[in-house]
């Protein structure tokens, strides 16, 4: 998310970043200190009312308009499928899929009126090959992939592009448990990456 926000600002966009803690304000200030136009909004996308409020706060920060939305947020919970807690399943699906639909829907209400907009959803390679000990994440990202296709079919003729990017493993905080080179899973993942690195 950080890199995508930075890239959009480097291209001249005014950007709103969303985070679950007050750290989002420090990150936004850091971008502003570098000469970018950036705003921070705090919201917990596991809570439906905060998804709507967070979206409204973002649009307000941008003066009431929206051209591009990137749904790059997500969480991860790791358990074998047979013992995966249903509460964590619900949390992951709420953040990684349900909030994506709500944000796409709310963005489209603005974009369709003006006949222009770009919606970019972050899916995952697990949408195709599955994962290990991440059934909720895999289900959610598979849902994002299919949802993106459906929304694209619905809105492209009216000027709103909807696409998904499905990156492989990235060295992020969410994957910190896998980043230890001594971890056998790290080796399995790295061996199937052509560049042999994350």
Give the positions of each predicted feature.
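Canonical Rossmann dinucleotide-binding motif of NAD(H)/NADP(H)-dependent dehydrogenases/reductases
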Residues: 1-16
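Conserved glycine-rich Rossmann-like NAD(P)H-binding loop of the short-chain dehydrogenase/reductase
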Residues: 13-26
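Substrate-binding pocket helix/loop in short-chain dehydrogenase/reductase
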Residues: 51, 80-81, 85-93, 185, ...
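Conserved NAD(P)H cofactor-binding loop of Rossmann-fold oxidoreductase domains
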Residues: 72-77
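Active-site helix of classical SDR
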Residues: 104, 140, 148
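Residue(s) in the substrate-gating loop at a strand-loop-helix junction
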Residues: 124
């Amino acid at each position: 998310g950080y890199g995508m926000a930075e890239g959009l600002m480097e291209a001249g966009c005014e950007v709103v970043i969303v985070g679950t803690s007050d750290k989002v304000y420090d990150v936004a200030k850091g971008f502003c200190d570098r000469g970018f136009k950036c705003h921070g909004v705090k919201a917990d996308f596991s809570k439906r009312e905060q998804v709507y409020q967070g979206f409204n706060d973002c649009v307000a920060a941008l003066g009431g308009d929206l051209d591009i939305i990137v749904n790059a947020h997500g969480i991860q919970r790791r358990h074998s499928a047979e013992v995966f807690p249903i509460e964590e399943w619900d949390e992951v699906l709420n953040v990684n899929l349900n909030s994506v639909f709500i944000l796409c829907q709310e963005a489209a209400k603005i974009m369709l009126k003006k006949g222009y907009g770009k919606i970019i959803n972050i899916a995952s390679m697990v949408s195709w090959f599955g994962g290990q000990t991440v059934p909720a994440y895999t289900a959610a990202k598979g849902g994002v992939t299919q949802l993106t296709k459906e929304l694209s079919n619905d809105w492209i003729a009216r000027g709103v592009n909807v696409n998904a990017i499905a990156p492989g493993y990235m060295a992020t905080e969410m994957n910190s448990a896998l980043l230890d080179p001594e971890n056998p899973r790290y080796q399995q993942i790295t061996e199937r990456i052509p560049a042999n690195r994350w």
